[in-house]
Amino acid sequence: MIYTSDKMEEAAVLDAAQLMCAAARTAPKTRGIDNVRTLVLTGDDILALADKMEETDLRLNNGERTFLSRDAGNLRRSKAVVLVGIEKKPYGLNCGYCGFEGCAACVEGKGTCFFCGTDLGIAVSSAVSTAANLRIDCRVMFSIGRCAAEMSYAEGNTIWLGIPLSTSGKNPYFDRK
């Protein structure tokens, strides 16, 4: 049997995406509370998210195209995207690091617990280091996560970051314009 480079690279990207999800899941977390969520999108689901990014760009920027449309173009050239999210809820430490008096005030004021961002960052770092170890091109994009939050991929209030994946002769995420 002959395996073409296209098929092998596509399989490598999906294998990497699985391992990235595992790395995000097993990353250290505040108080050991696991609020991490992961998803992998391919094919038409990538295109739908890219469309959402372009629609959001035009809506937020008075019909002008900005970085959201640029990033949507990067997403369209990706074989897969790993979404890593964290459920937006306080961790019960009442530390006030969020800027509120405590967790109840944070919830009432619709704030974001400091540890949500911390845990999301650690999980994403674990995921992208896995991709790097496997020589899969990737880039962390808040723009993808911003628009993924509008797609209702998960119940509740989730903060997402997107990690598009590629295997091409040149990293498409390197010199974006």
Language-model regions, residue ranges each:
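Acidic, surface-exposed loops and disordered segments
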Residues: 1-177
